[in-house]
Amino acid sequence: MSDYWEKRAAWDMYERMADAEDNADLVARIYRSASAQIVFSAQDIFEKYMTKHKLSKAEAWRFLNSFQDKDSIQKLLLEIKNKDSGKNKQELLKELEAPAYRARIERLQRLLQQVDTVMQNVYQQEQRFDTSFFEQLAENAYYRTIYNTQRKTGLGFSFSHVDQKQIERVLRMNWSGKHYSKRIWKNTDDLAKTIKDELLVSLLTGRTDRETAAVITEKFGGGAIAARRLIRTESCFFASELTAQAYKECGIKKYRYMATLDLRTSKIC
């Protein structure tokens, strides 16, 4: 009989993690929508074909890594002008400072600002989606554990209902060293910086519009993966924490914690 309840507990966790994947799918849509916004806004800024008077990718990254204010293209051009520059940089400046290129520079400047706005929106939506899901997950874990305990013992004992404050206390726990909302903020902020860097690399290296769109899409895909990883990790913790609280409510003094490696376990784990 104990084997049945072990399998039942494992199945309950499987269902909770399946729900976590569904929530991660919803968050991934937010990232895809944000990616589409940036890709659309980047249209007509970059050339359809590679231009010759540009820096190599290595040169562009070397320069950007030493440049602090990446929100101002004018300061970027001034920095290039002030540094010891070779023929390629002189030709690049001539092209970027030409009147015909001015409109593109202005659109790119607006796009850099738009990236911050878009990622702020991503952060707010992701935090709202995750918090709502974690609350439901925690409540479900609590009541499901008590229900299973009553079935296993055959006792219909009374128990305290889990309240919102109890769930909020668990959600506020910095169990991994940083609250999940701060981790979401760091992930979205890092992604915003990465996207802006890649847009500037496209400007300096002459990447085409299609190449730029592909890079942006790839980076947002990486952001969605980081968001999914966060949801999986936090979901597992919150479900386990409320399960433990439910056991305590049932008067259980000791329980055996069962863990297993799954296909998503990282190399560190």
Regions found by a protein language model. Name each.
Residues M1-T217:
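N-terminal leader/targeting and assembly helices and adjacent pre-domain segments
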Residues G222-C269:
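Acidic, glycine-rich two-metal-ion catalytic cores of nucleic acid-processing enzymes
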